[in-house]
Amino acid sequence: MAGRYDPNPFDEEQVNPFSNPRSAASATNSRPAPLNPDRADYNYGFGPTVDIPLDTSTDGKKKERDLQAKEAELRKREQEVRRKEEAIARAGIVIEEKNWPPFFPIIHHDITNEIPIHLRTLQYVAFFSLLGLVLCLTWNVVSVTAAWIKGEGVKIWFLAIIYFIAGVPGAYALWYRPLYRAFRTDSAIKFGWFFMFYLLHIGFCILAAVAPPIVFKGKSLTGILSAIDVVGDYTLVGIFYFIGFGFFCLETLISIWVIQQVYMHFRGGGKTAEMKREAALGAMGAALR
């Protein structure tokens, strides 16, 4: 049985701080240090506040006036552009954006959107004949260059270069573009322009395919006669000339088909009388000037 004055195990431990000075000093040192009043910052590190003036009505009105002036200027420019577009449309002028070839646009060419659907196939074949002429003249330059290297002389090479430089842009400007515009606008005068220069194109292709010995023994063109003449001395160059002869023959056949189809369309649409009327009106206008 426990005694009356036995200690209670659940009582808190009573410590006398005066009984041991060292323990009292440690207790004093364990108290938290007071906060430094200089370090207290109630702005959370954002610095002092800056007073912003609330009277911005003058600046707002100025900005509003500037916006209104810019809007009026844009409206004026839009009206001016619209007037120019209407004037161009009344004059019948079509603004053409260069879009071909895609990697370096130099001409406007859009058969799908500008040529009537029943004429697109014919226009595409005419376009292929233009590309065929480019191929023929390019191969002609290659073949004549080979002949020049083998000792045929530099004059035929210069002639081949002249054929290419004059033939490609000349064909586009003189007969392909007039046909394109004739199909697009149904102009009889454009058809007449096409027929005149396309016949010259066919004549040149026939001359090149034959290559008669008229100018510098005919070796500036890869025709059949020049191919026969060259193949006896230089077999490889002769093969080049025979390939060029085949290209010119194919170009001639395609061109004959194109002009036949265009002429059938021209006659079927009654463009002969219309072309005569347009020519007469043009001559009358030139006389009155």
From Swiss-Prot:
It is found in: Cell membrane; Cytoplasmic vesicle, Secretory vesicle membrane. This is Secretory carrier-associated membrane protein. One of its GO terms (biological process) is protein transport. Its main location: membrane. PANTHER family: SECRETORY CARRIER-ASSOCIATED MEMBRANE PROTEIN (PTHR10687:SF58), SECRETORY CARRIER-ASSOCIATED MEMBRANE PROTEIN SCAMP (PTHR10687). InterPro entries: SCAMP. Belongs to the SCAMP family. It holds the Pfam family SCAMP. The keyword RNA-binding does not apply. Residues 1-123, 260-289 are cytoplasmic. The gene is PSAM2. Probably involved in membrane trafficking. The chain crosses the membrane at residues 124-144, 156-176, 191-211, 239-259. It comes from the Eukaryota. Residues 16-31 have a biased composition (Polar residues). Induction: Up-regulated in early interactions with pathogenic fingi and down-regulated at late stages of mycorrhiza. It is a multi-pass membrane protein. Keywords: Cell membrane, Coiled coil, Cytoplasmic vesicle, Membrane, Transmembrane, Transmembrane helix, Transport. GO terms for cellular component: plasma membrane; recycling endosome membrane; trans-Golgi network membrane; transport vesicle membrane. Residues 59-98 form a coiled coil. Residues 1-65 are annotated as: Disordered.
